[in-house]
């Protein structure tokens, strides 16, 4: 349930005479329920009552109409919910409608303040549900335009919206979800190449962020890719991927104790780990005074097979080649290869 019930909710509703009468009746269940709901508004509007300055109760009107209310009750009955919880579900529905209207007004103004207000009221789950729906519609619209969206829309559009929806895209991409309309028509599918690019860019973006400073990492991310586009023009993302393939290590060793002795056993590095290590090397070697330019210079140098990052890779490989004779202990390691 999206909204927490009050402590005295059961005592307030279930011990009333009207409610018991409805539970006993079987034939006129919908009509009797609606009659009770309309007649005893003081019962149903327990959560909406507020006191004025004088001390009198001021009751707010509900947003659901008669027809919508009846349909909602019928749907609950079909789904198999118990009758005694109908009041609760109706109240939940009304509050969610009100919250959506509130969010549409103030979604782009003062996000932090709005978040605090919603969090205090206990609407966190409802807020997430509403916001995710909007973002999925956006991504569906976004991907429908072209296969390579950053080429068709330009760099600014790509950088602006990549950071905003990167996490959502990756979640959808990893589980291989298809974007659908309300009529369940397939809009588009994510290709494997696009998924890999998004994942690699997202890993790099997560590596840049530290202490939750996302705005700073966004600015670094944008400046770096602007510099890359200025030099390499259309193939600026392909250059970044080429750099990762040149730098990433393919082999590494694992330390194991066998018969009371240490052995460094060389193994193949998993793809995800190899890419993440190359990105970590890149970020750690950058100057923290001017990160964007230093990252750009490192990428350019390593594309020419020079620089400190390629030395790291050679050292990594040489350490594993020295312990070549211990490959016979590979059977003791639990690897996916």
Swiss-Prot record:
Q: Which Gene3D superfamilies match?
A: Ribosomal protein S7 domain
Protein localization: Mitochondrion
Q: Which organism is it from?
A: Acanthamoeba castellanii (Amoeba)
UniProt-listed InterPro entries: Ribosomal_uS7_bac/org-type, Ribosomal_uS7_dom, Ribosomal_uS7_dom_sf
Family note? Belongs to the universal ribosomal protein uS7 family.
Q: Which gene encodes it?
A: RPS7
> What keywords were assigned to this record?
Mitochondrion, Ribonucleoprotein, Ribosomal protein, RNA-binding, rRNA-binding
GO CC terms of this entry = mitochondrion; small ribosomal subunit
What CDD domains does the database record attribute to this sequence?
A: uS7
Q: Which cysteines are joined by disulfide bonds?
A: none
**GO terms, molecular function:** rRNA binding; structural constituent of ribosome
What's the protein name? Answer: Small ribosomal subunit protein uS7m
Source organism phylogeny: Eukaryota, Amoebozoa, Discosea, Longamoebia, Centramoebida
What main location does UniProt list? mitochondrion
